[in-house]
Every structure is written in structure tokens, then in C-alpha cells.
Amino acid sequence: MEKSFTHIEAGRARMVDISEKNDVSRLARAAGEIVLSAETLEKIRTGTVEKGNVFATARVAAVLAVKKTPETIPMCHQIPITGIDVDFEIGEEAVSAVVEVRTVGKTGVEMEALTGVSSALLTVWDMVKSAEKDEIGNYPHTLIRNIRVLEKLKGKA
């Protein structure tokens, strides 16, 4: 059976009508990572990044992005967000971010979780870009990767 796109009807984009769906608990967790130099990772680890606390700033950015997802993803519904958790981990070559979003609503929150992760990682980049630039101002080794949905739950979140 061929899958069809729910947001496209007769070749035009549209917002899916969810009015007949029941409100249920929903949860989505998304993750991603940003590859950084060993020197930059050490600055984050020791709290010596010139712009300030990288994770505190990126956490706020993730929360704001989750709440504003319908403003940047055209077919996303405005839904009540009941909880957001943002976690970071410093690895050997990268910082990992995980964003968990919860709601009681008619549609899932995976786009909100993905948007939160993306914004968190972009904010990490912004906070450390002066340390990551090469001599001509480029970022030859900085890389955001592996942004994905880890988990999506409906009815038992």
C-alpha cells in the first residue's frame, strides 16, 4: 500500500484538520549533535567560553524554539506545550542535545522537539564560533549532524 502525504491535497499544501481527534497525552524526544574542536569542548567543560554559559543559553533557545515552532514550520498546529526538558552531554568530539516535549493534545510534538534540538545546536555554534573559526573565518570542522526523533509516544506519555 502506497503512503500518501496528509498535508498535500490535489497538489497544494494545506493544514490537516485535527478537530475530530481526541486530546491524549503525547511525548516526543529528539536528539542531535554538534562536532567541535577539542579546545572548544574543553572551554565548554570548564565554563570559559567568552560569550557565557553555553548550555544555559542553548537551553533557553530550545525552549523558545519549541514554543514558536508553528511560526516557522508552516503546517504545524498551535498546540499547548505542557513540558519541555533539554539535556546536553559533552562527548569526545561533540556536544549532544536531547529535547523532550510533552503535550495533551490532538497531534504529536515531534516537530517541536526537532525544532528545539536544531535551535539548541545552532545556539551552541553561535556561542563558540569565535573559538571554532580558522584563520580566514571559516568553520572547517564544525558540523551539526544526526538530528532525529528518538521516541514518539501517544496515550502514555
Curated annotation (Swiss-Prot):
It catalyses: (8S)-3',8-cyclo-7,8-dihydroguanosine 5'-triphosphate = cyclic pyranopterin phosphate + diphosphate. SUPFAM superfamilies: Molybdenum cofactor biosynthesis protein C, MoaC. InterPro entries: Mo_CF_biosynth-C_arc, MoaC, MoaC_sf, MoCo_biosynth_MoaA/MoaC, Mopterin_CF_biosynth-C_dom. GO terms for biological process: Mo-molybdopterin cofactor biosynthetic process. GO terms for molecular function: cyclic pyranopterin monophosphate synthase activity. Its EC number is 4.6.1.17. The keyword Lyase applies. It holds the Pfam family MoaC. The active site is at residue 126. Pathway: Cofactor biosynthesis; molybdopterin biosynthesis. The keyword Lyase applies. Disulfide bonds: none annotated. Belongs to the MoaC family. Homohexamer; trimer of dimers. HAMAP family: MoaC_A. Catalyzes the conversion of (8S)-3',8-cyclo-7,8-dihydroguanosine 5'-triphosphate to cyclic pyranopterin monophosphate (cPMP). This is Probable cyclic pyranopterin monophosphate synthase. It comes from Methanosarcina mazei (strain ATCC BAA-159 / DSM 3647 / Goe1 / Go1 / JCM 11833 / OCM 88).
